[in-house]
Amino acid sequence: MVINKNLEEQVIDLFYKLGFPKDLFGFIWIITPILTYTLGVTIGISVIVWLERKISAGVQQRIGPEHAGPLGIIQALADGAKLLSKEDIIPSRGDSFLFNVGPVMVVVPVFLSYLVIPLGHGIILADLDIGVFFWIAVSSVAPLGLLTAGYGSNNKYSSLGGLRAAAQSISYEIPLALCVLSVSPLSNSLSTVDIVEAQSKYGFWGWNSWRQPIGFVAFFISSLAECERLPFDLPEAEEELVAGYQTEYSGIKFGLFYVASHPNLLTSSLSATILYLGGWNSPIPFLFLPKFDRLGWNSTDETSEVISITIAIIITLAKAYSFLFISIATRWTLPRVRMDQLLDLGWKSLLPVALGNSLPTASFQLSSP
């Protein structure tokens, strides 16, 4: 996270004057960025729920939510309160441990993914050298939670839903990783911050979506499948499997699956923004994020720093929510594919395309001086 040294020194002096121990300040200084990010993700989930309901209503020529606050903006809060008030039921013949741990295995990896997602230069919880691989590795754990939840329910529909989730994840995780491998050589790094910085030279035309158009399309399709969104929501197909792995769940555990679904969609949109859409960089160079020294401003001025950070976050979120709008609109316009079509698309189409796209990129980078 961005840390202002003057502010840090002022806070330390204030803590000493109030008589608080130094360890308490260190704990608060570490936990504050995490809580801030968690609050931001929570607000992002609420916005996604509202957008999804409104976009689906527009596609189907309905009004959508309008009673839960102005224009229905607190519909997510109403849904959460409803789920909290419902009874939490555990199947008598199911495995209670696996049944309880399944939703946790789904939710935790999604929130861990936000550790390596930057919203601006320095606005990141953990700038790892293997940031994009960390995101792929963590996101691949969630389907194991779905499989665990389905198996622990001791229900044939739940078990089939969990097996479908595992098969779907394996089919699309490899093309997704190959798409990331195609982007990484362009910046000579696996760090998410370095990948964004490598796209900052030429504005709109410097984005990786122009240098990797095939990879961008493959990444978009694979991310939809990873998020289990229509037309790839086969693990929870209501017409075939009642509700898939969610069949036996109720109350807060049922809500945890939706708590994981919407942040996962936001994570995929932010990842697409970072890898292919230039991240926090403006489409037009120096228009919205000017160099402060060129304007005669002091680059250490706190006001200028706050303005730069705010604009970077706005640009990143604008790109992410534009990508997210396409994902939501796709859900309500395309029909669900069959299981064999899903696997054929992953293994016979996306995998060869992603592999063929990564080989020329790697060869060019190795041959270039």
From Swiss-Prot:
E.C. designation(s): 7.1.1.-
Compartments (UniProt record): Plastid, Chloroplast thylakoid membrane
GO molecular function, one term: NADH dehydrogenase activity
Keyword terms of this UniProt record: Chloroplast, Membrane, NAD, NADP, Plastid, Plastoquinone, Quinone, Thylakoid, Translocase, Transmembrane, Transmembrane helix
Main localization category: plastid
Membrane topology: Multi-pass membrane protein
Residues annotated as transmembrane: 25-45, 104-124, 130-150, 270-290, 306-326
InterPro entries cross-referenced by the UniProt entry: NADH_UbQ_OxRdtase_su1/FPO (IPR001694), NADH_UbQ_OxRdtase_su1_CS (IPR018086)
Major enzyme class: translocase
GO BP terms: aerobic respiration; photosynthesis, light reaction
Keyword Translocase applies: yes
Reaction(s) this enzyme catalyzes, per UniProt: a plastoquinone + NADH + (n+1) H(+)(in) = a plastoquinol + NAD(+) + n H(+)(out); a plastoquinone + NADPH + (n+1) H(+)(in) = a plastoquinol + NADP(+) + n H(+)(out)
GO-annotated cellular components: chloroplast thylakoid membrane
Subunit structure, interactors included: NDH is composed of at least 16 different subunits, 5 of which are encoded in the nucleus.
Family, per entry: Belongs to the complex I subunit 1 family.
Function field: NDH shuttles electrons from NAD(P)H:plastoquinone, via FMN and iron-sulfur (Fe-S) centers, to quinones in the photosynthetic chain and possibly in a chloroplast respiratory chain. The immediate electron acceptor for the enzyme in this species is believed to be plastoquinone. Couples the redox reaction to proton translocation, and thus conserves the redox energy in a proton gradient.
Protein name: NAD(P)H-quinone oxidoreductase subunit 1, chloroplastic
Species this protein is from: Huperzia lucidula (Shining clubmoss)
Lineage of source species: Eukaryota, Viridiplantae, Streptophyta, Embryophyta, Tracheophyta
